[in-house]
From Swiss-Prot:
HAMAP family referenced in this protein's UniProt entry, alphabetically: TruA
Domain of life from the UniProt record: Bacteria
Alphabetized GO MF terms: RNA binding; tRNA pseudouridine(38-40) synthase activity
Gene: truA
Protein name from the UniProt record: tRNA pseudouridine synthase A
Organism listed in the record: Shewanella baltica (strain OS195)
Active-site residues from the entry: D51 (nucleophile)
NCBIfam families according to UniProt: hisT_truA
Keyword Isomerase among record annotations: yes
Length: 261
């Protein structure tokens, strides 16, 4: 049978989602816990591979198993065998047409900036700290140039392995909640480092170092070297993955938990 899980994790201390030799990863920990509960080797497929230090509140995975277990085993049982910074949030049996990555129609990320003169002690790995005076409205206005299907070469990592730089950004919003500035962006898919590279350039606009038209200019240049530095990983969360209604997967609050939704 094929099982889908909703996963939440704190990416700090992991070398990203993907299983790698000799380093710890979220995938390796999840597969270990699932294999214990299933009493057989389990391999998982995810909706989106997050980088080192990046978090998720809405990651979705699927796996195949011959084990017959109830919902409590796949949630409470797996959680009992996971580190405290990884948690299963929901489980659902799905048909064989479902694939966590290839069935997804959209992914959504939130990047959380703590905009204050002094760095935080609490949540220091859950937010990215920037001390300058950030104009969130200015960032939001500039970000609208990203909408639609476009060539995002200027915002892809040099090591990105995607065959095409084109992605379709469905929506992007930048808002302020007190000392937090949140960049909320959804697209059909994302290039390697695309969200963090976009945030890095939006910050330059928000800090008044670049004009409102800069995002559009960067898209036209198709040159990663012309854009700003990549934003830090700690503020980034994969918060939602969209699938066709036929699969009827559970939907939870987007998170992260300390934000007002």
């Amino acid at each position: 049978m094929r099982i889908a899980l909703g996963i939440e994790y704190d990416g700090n201390g992991y070398f990203g989602w993907q299983r790698q030799a000799e380093v710890d990863s979220v995938q390796a920990q999840l597969e270990r816990a699932l294999s214990i509960v299933a009493n057989e080797p389990i391999g998982v497929f995810c909706a989106g591979r997050t980088d080192a230090g990046v978090h998720a509140t809405g990651q979705v995975v699927h796996f195949e198993t011959n084990a017959i277990r109830n919902e409590g085993a796949w949630t409470l049982g797996v959680n009992a065998n996971l580190p405290d910074n990884i948690a299963v949030r929901w489980v659902k049996e799905v048909d064989d047409s479902f694939h966590a990555r290839f069935s997804a129609t959209a992914r959504r990320y939130r990047y959380v900036i703590y905009n204050h003169s002094f760095r935080p002690g609490i949540l220091r790995h859950g937010v990215s700290h920037y001390h300058g005076d950030i104009d969130a409205d200015r960032m939001h206005q500039a970000a609208q140039a990203l909408l639609g299907e476009q060539d995002f070469t200027s915002f892809r990592a040099v090591q990105c392995q995607s065959k095409t730089p084109f992605r379709n950004v469905h929506c992007v919003n930048v808002t302020r909640q007190g000392m937090y500035v949140i960049v909320d962006i959804a697209a059909n898919a994302f290039l390697h480092h695309m969200v963090r590279n976009i945030v890095g350039s939006l910050l330059e606009i928000g800090l008044g170092n670049q004009p409102l038209t800069w995002m559009g200019d960067l898209l036209a240049l198709k040159d990663r070297n012309q854009a700003a530095a990549t934003a830090k990983p700690h503020g980034l969360y994969l918060v939602d993955v969209t699938y066709p209604e036929q699969y009827q997967l559970p939907k939870l609050a987007l998170g992260p938990l300390f934000m007002l939704d």
